[in-house]
């Protein structure tokens, strides 16, 4: 079925939902795992015209290469911690057809991804998707500017209260970190506006901002530390009113490895899941744990992400999935 969506400015955006057969990974106590992963340019072998040149059949991109990438992606998603329900944000996925192919793969079909929503700019090569084992109540797409990826808002009505996912993919640093910083601030400002409206209309709801933000939470640009920041998204290592809990700031966790993306031999904490104060308010879904998927086929022998290499047709992704888990309050 088609999910209700909001269309702003002249950007044509798409959102879909699909039902398919499947069941939850584990049974017993209710639990929720929310994850975010930039899959690094996951394209099928069908020519749509908007692909990057290297993913066109004329460049040698094939169905077998596509299926290999699907298989690897599904294996990595299978490394997520066991839960009774799952919501996963995927960046850099081509279109809804690729989402459908991915969630039907054997390694993750047992998770029970019944629903999904996608958003992207008209003519853009990649989209952001939210896949879920929980029914999607509604989805809206919020434009940022003509040359920026939209914000995908997805609403869930669970047994433990309302949950909203704001799926993002902020502007990359291509062109210079400082030169592109204003674009990430623009996106973060839209996220702030959306989240405030959501919380005003749904007091006590849980809101999560998930995706590749292309900068770190202490960079004092789109995000900044709650105590003294004027940034659009104020973050903290604990759950405070009018701020977002950011696990990258929580030094008590000792997360390994030290980031989700490696650039110039340095770990970067670009992929994020920001949790609203409702994640620790004693009601509904309560934050439990967090982590980074760094095992199996996504980890190289020298402790790096096994990046996808189009020329060699090998690898998985240059980003690692990050995740948080929740349990219902007792």
Feature map (PLM): residue ranges:
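N-terminal, active-site-proximal structural segment of metallo-dependent hydrolase catalytic domains
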Residues: 18-105, 120-121, 304, 308-310, ...
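Second-shell loop/turn segments in exported
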Residues: 57-64, 84-90, 118, 141, ...
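Bacterial N-terminal signal peptides
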Residues: 8-17
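Active-site beta-strand/loop signature of hydrolases that rely on acidic residues for catalysis
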Residues: 34-39, 73-100, 165, 191-224, ...
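Active-site His/acidic residue clusters
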Residues: 50, 166-180
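Structured beta-strand-rich core segments of catalytic domains in phosphoester-bond hydrolases
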Residues: 39, 93-171
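Bacterial N-terminal signal peptides that target proteins for export
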Residues: 1-7
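Metal-dependent phosphoester-hydrolase catalytic domains
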Residues: 20-24, 197-207, 215-330
């Amino acid at each position: 079925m088609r999910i209700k969506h909001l269309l702003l400015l002249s950007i044509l955006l798409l959102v879909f939902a699909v039902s398919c057969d499947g069941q939850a990974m584990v049974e017993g106590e209710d639990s929720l795992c929310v994850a975010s992963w930039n899959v690094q340019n996951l394209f099928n072998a069908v020519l749509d015209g908007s692909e990057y040149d290297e993913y066109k059949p004329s460049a040698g991109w094939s169905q077998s290469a596509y299926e290999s990438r699907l298989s690897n992606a599904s294996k990595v998603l299978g490394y997520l911690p066991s839960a009774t329900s799952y919501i996963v944000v995927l960046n850099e996925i081509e279109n809804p057809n690729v989402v459908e192919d991915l969630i039907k793969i054997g390694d993750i079909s047992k998770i029970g991804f019944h629903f999904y929503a996608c958003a992207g700019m008209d003519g853009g090569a990649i989209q952001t998707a939210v896949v879920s084992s929980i029914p999607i109540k509604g989805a809206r797409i919020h434009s940022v500017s003509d040359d920026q990826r939209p914000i995908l808002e997805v609403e869930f009505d669970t047994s433990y209260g309302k949950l909203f996912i704001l799926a993002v993919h902020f502007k990359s640093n291509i062109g210079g970190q400082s030169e592109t910083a204003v674009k990430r601030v623009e996106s973060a400002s839209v996220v702030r506006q959306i989240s405030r409206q959501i919380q005003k209309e749904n007091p006590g709801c849980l809101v999560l901002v998930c995706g590749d933000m292309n900068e770190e939470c202490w960079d004092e640009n789109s995000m900044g530390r709650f105590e003294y920041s004027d940034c659009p998204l104020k973050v903290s290592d604990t759950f405070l009113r009018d701020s977002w809990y950011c696990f990258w700031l929580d030094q008590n966790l000792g997360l390994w490895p030290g980031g989700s993306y490696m650039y110039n031999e340095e770990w970067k904490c670009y992929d994020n899941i920001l949790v609203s104060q409702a994640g620790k308010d004693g009601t509904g879904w309560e934050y439990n744990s967090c982590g980074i998927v760094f095992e199996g086929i996504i980890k190289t022998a020298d402790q790096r992400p096994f990046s996808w290499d189009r020329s060699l047709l090998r690898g998985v992704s240059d980003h690692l999935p990050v995740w948080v888990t929740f349990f219902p309050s007792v």
